């Protein structure tokens, strides 16, 4: 009897939850809402009811987000100054106490139901959406590929050594985005090159490893705080391995393009010699620049 009561109660709660979701989606009308960004640097109007993340993307504000609204990547953090409603249980596990106190929220979980004021890092205002085509695919090891994107629109990218892009890939529940470091040097502005390890069952890496020359791709960027120290007096020590060599390669080539005499050490970590790649390129670079070890 108790089991039957539990089943009935659970069914009622599930039914009510589904009804509320449907009602909110199709019956709730929040009208026009205004979002004020960074104290008025940008101001845009939209129909309320969707997520803050969707609202930002629709207005070409491409903040980081890996899973498109599932609330588990923690990347889409913004500061809500006004109008975000109460903090949700789906957000609290991913926010520190200090973040919760300062109004940090997950944009994928916050619904736009009224006028809002938010803040995001200034640099995210300059993130762009790129359309490109695959111009090269090269197998580096048994599970790592180098994939080159030729930029179409816009046809140039401006990034700093160490930054990354977010590639859009088709997933079972819709489009997902995955972050990959840029391996091509900053002076190669018409391409973006990635070094990607195939993760068994991974949506993003499987998609990229299956790309062929001529395939269209879409991504946003650049993002990231992992950057080269631009003080020419600072000696650089680069440590990496596997797909983690992508930003290291970008950093090394960018260093010697800008500072011919700057000192740089490279330590390439691997399990076997078969896991080493780009060695010929680095050896050639060391012949041109004796400060590269």
Indicate residue ranges for each PLM-predicted region.
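Membrane-cytosol interface motif
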Residues: 33-54
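Ferredoxin-reductase
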Residues: 129-216, 270-272
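Iron-sulfur (Fe-S) cluster-binding segments and ferredoxin-like electron-carrier domains
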Residues: 53-64, 75-125
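Feature marks short, highly hydrophobic, charge-poor N-terminal signal-anchor/signal peptide-like helices
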Residues: 1-10
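Short, charged beta-turn/beta-strand-edge "cap" motif at the junction between a beta-strand
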Residues: 112, 124, 170-174, 221-226
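Transmembrane-cytosolic junction motif
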Residues: 18-39
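FNR/FR-type flavoprotein reductase catalytic core
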Residues: 200-293
